[in-house]
Amino acid sequence: MKMELKVKPIENGTVIDHISGSKALKVYKILNIEEKLPMTIALNVPSKKGVMKDILKIEGLELTKEDVNKIALISPDATINIIKEGIVIKKFKVDLPKRIDGIIKCTNPNCITNKENIDGKFSIEQKNTLKIRCEYCEKFINSIIISK
């Protein structure tokens, strides 16, 4: 017997779709979403492309440009849907900017940003297989630590 889960559409807010499988909770965490906001988190849902995806629906949330950049770092294929009065008024794919300031922490313990209270500045050197370089110490980082 095939079971289907019905999730009520949101009236006003944001739907983050096509999140890489098992990454919705990481997206939720980096966005610092208020716990009082109604939301639906769907994990490992089959997509039309045959791969697993996650979906995050948050009633009453408007994303900032910084939020979208954070999502792009974690799930570069994610799609953002802005909902007003039950209608999708804007839909777009996230896109990594050429430079990211202040939201990533350098993993090099000798970097000046880790010794003093300085926000990190990073260049996106390669998007398809994420390659990020610290503009202070020039180190390429493999693991992303979101600082804000």
UniProtKB/Swiss-Prot annotation:
Source domain of life: Archaea
Keywords: Metal-binding, Pyrimidine biosynthesis, Zinc
UniProt binding sites for Zn(2+): C106, C111, C134, C137
Pfam families attached to this UniProt entry: PyrI (PF01948), PyrI_C (PF02748)
GO terms assigned for molecular function: metal ion binding
A biological-process GO annotation: pyrimidine nucleotide biosynthetic process
Named cofactor requirement(s): Zn(2+)
Subunit: Contains catalytic and regulatory chains.
The protein's name: Aspartate carbamoyltransferase regulatory chain
Organism encoding this protein: Methanococcus maripaludis (strain C7 / ATCC BAA-1331)
Lineage: Archaea, Methanobacteriati, Methanobacteriota, Methanomada group, Methanococci
